[in-house]
Curated annotation (Swiss-Prot):
<keyword id="KW-0479">Metal-binding</keyword>
<feature type="propeptide">
    <location>
        <begin position="1"/>
        <end position="2"/>
    </location>
</feature>
<dbReference type="InterPro" id="IPR020878">
    <property type="entry name" value="RuBisCo_large_chain_AS"/>
</dbReference>
<keyword id="KW-0503">Monooxygenase</keyword>
<dbReference type="InterPro" id="IPR020888">
    <property type="entry name" value="RuBisCO_lsuI"/>
</dbReference>
<keyword id="KW-0560">Oxidoreductase</keyword>
<feature type="binding site">
    <location>
        <position position="327"/>
    </location>
    <ligand>
        <name>substrate</name>
    </ligand>
</feature>
<comment type="function">
    <text>RuBisCO catalyzes two reactions: the carboxylation of D-ribulose 1,5-bisphosphate, the primary event in carbon dioxide fixation, as well as the oxidative fragmentation of the pentose substrate in the photorespiration process. Both reactions occur simultaneously and in competition at the same active site.</text>
</comment>
<keyword id="KW-0602">Photosynthesis</keyword>
<dbReference type="Pfam" id="PF02788">
    <property type="entry name" value="RuBisCO_large_N"/>
</dbReference>
<dbReference type="GO" id="GO:0000287">
    <property type="term" value="F:magnesium ion binding"/>
</dbReference>
<feature type="site" description="Transition state stabilizer">
    <location>
        <position position="334"/>
    </location>
</feature>
<keyword id="KW-0460">Magnesium</keyword>
<keyword id="KW-0120">Carbon dioxide fixation</keyword>
<keyword id="KW-0601">Photorespiration</keyword>
<dbReference type="GO" id="GO:0009507">
    <property type="term" value="C:chloroplast"/>
</dbReference>
<keyword id="KW-0007">Acetylation</keyword>
């Protein structure tokens, strides 16, 4: 060994492997206002103490690796390392802990959800010392959130663009989602919009397939929008899905939508990717387009309770990346969603300031400062009998989207849309008169049926349809 090598090895460096907790578990640490805070649900392998597991998560998602490296001496680990600063057992579970990790802000590129997730949930989820790992929540400090544009427009600007106030907006996903020609697709859009809906929607997997190329669909849907607007005197829209195989193609589709003069486009933000989504959100703000976001693929990531990432984290990431609407579950429909948990992340989407509330799954107080809000979209297995509950649960700043609940009407698409509009107007009027929608909902709908044969027919068709399954992902409750 040369003298040079001996000198390098002998100055403040000891090779080998040491426990993560010696460096990355710091229960005495006081978090800073500028730290990004994360709450992980950690399930260690047998024999791995929670302190070591939490420290491993902090290390592997920040500056650490499996062994000591001499280049640690070339930087300040105390400045850049993640720190596991608190651990608590999960109620009702023998071998799960919530580990809280603080990350210094300098670890992350400004305005990049992609970089934030690459660090926090990149490698660590495959770590062998853990049986399972789930990111439950993030606290995004204003010093970081202000580096993002956020939603292209936000709730109030959208209401002003549409000139629609004091009620939820109504939408419909065109079905069958695949197989229609562009002209028949546009016809279905027109009938739904003419019948009383505010929006119609491309399904998430409608892009540019052989049976219906995107440009043809855009043209026929624009025709449906203009014709229905002329006949109803209301502003209408169709979520034109601009998701594509490349960012360049996606922007080309958004440009064509703008040239047609339509008000809104759509993106599948998880399958399309956060870089593409942020790019499209910036284009939409610069060019006056609203942006509807579909969360296709989310359940692959968020549905299992002990591994993956909770949707509240994906919702926060979307608000930062940019979107004016996002699907959020229904509570009452066919898709997963516990009520209190759903309302928790709905508030995280819409409100400026959200207090910590573990009863709703919110681990940290979140201050969005002036970032615009996102409208939650309730969609999936809902029909007219659900209208009172949806109006009561989601309030005015929401989109209630009935696909089969519009197009499945026995008299056709326009009567299906009319039935939904009548049901909504009846519920909003009853609420404004002080009636209890949760208790009197069925009575309100039955009364409205007397002066709407379309609603009466819809109520008869779906009177026995229910989706009564226990949710998989639930709030932890003390036993």
């Amino acid at each position: 060994m040369s003298p040079q090598t001996e000198t390098k090895a002998g100055v403040g460096f000891q090779a080998g492997v040491k426990d993560y907790k010696l460096t990355y578990y710091t229960p005495e640490y006081e978090t800073k206002d500028t730290d990004i805070l994360a709450a992980f649900r950690v399930s260690p392998q047998p024999g791995v103490p929670p302190e070591e597991a939490g420290a491993a998560v902090a290390a592997e998602s920040s500056t650490g690796t499996w062994t000591t490296v001499w280049t640690d001496g070339l930087t300040s680990l105390d400045r850049y390392k993640g720190r596991c600063y608190h651990i608590e057992p999960v109620a009702g579970e023998d071998s799960q802990w919530i580990c809280y990790v603080a990350y210094p802000l300098d670890l992350f590129e400004e305005g990049s959800v992609t970089n934030m997730f690459t660090s926090i949930v990149g490698n660590v989820f495959g770590f062998k010392a853990l049986r399972a790992l789930r990111l439950e929540d993030l606290r995004i400090p204003p010093t970081y959130s202000k580096t993002f544009q956020g939603p292209p427009h936000g709730i109030q600007v959208e209401r002003d663009k549409l000139n629609k106030y004091g009620r939820p907006l109504l939408g419909c996903t065109i079905k069958p989602k695949l197989g229609l020609s562009a002209k028949n697709y546009g016809r279905a859009c027109y009938e739904c919009l003419r019948g009383g809906l505010d929006f119609t929607k491309d399904d998430e997997n409608v892009n540019s397939q052989p049976f219906m190329r995107w440009r043809d669909r855009f043209v026929f849907c624009a025709e449906a929008i203009y014709k229905s607007q002329a006949e109803t005197g209301e502003i209408k829209g169709h979520y034109l899905n601009a998701t594509a195989g490349t960012c360049e193609e996606m922007i080309k589709r958004a440009v064509f939508a703008r040239e047609l003069g339509v008000p809104i486009v759509m993106h599948d933000y998880l399958t399309g990717g956060f870089t593409a989504n942020t790019t499209l959100a910036h284009y939409c703000r610069d060019n006056g387009l609203l942006l509807h976001i579909h969360r296709a693929m989310h359940a692959v990531i968020d549905r299992q309770k002990n591994h993956g990432m909770h949707f509240r984290v994906l919702a926060k990431a979307l608000r930062m990346s940019g979107g004016d609407h996002i699907h959020s579950g229904t509570v009452v429909g066919k898709l997963e969603g516990e009520r209190e948990m759903t309302l928790g992340f709905v508030d995280l989407l819409r409100d400026d300031f959200i207090e910590k509330d573990r009863a709703r799954g919110i681990f940290f107080t979140q201050d969005w400062v002036s970032m615009p809000g996102v409208i939650p979209v309730a969609s999936g297995g809902i029909h007219v009998w659900h209208m009172p509950a949806l109006t009561e649960i989601f309030g005015d700043d929401s989109v209630l989207q009935f696909g089969g609940g519009t197009l499945g009407h026995p008299w056709g698409n326009a009567p299906g849309a009319a039935a939904n509009r009548v049901a909504l107007e009846a519920c909003v009027q009853a609420r404004n008169e002080g009636r209890d929608l949760a208790r009197e909902g069925n009575e309100i709908i039955r009364a409205a049926c007397k002066w709407s044969p379309e609603l009466a027919a819809a109520c008869e068709v779906w009177k026995a349809i229910k989706f009564e399954f226990e949710p998989v992902d639930t709030i932890d409750k003390k036993v």
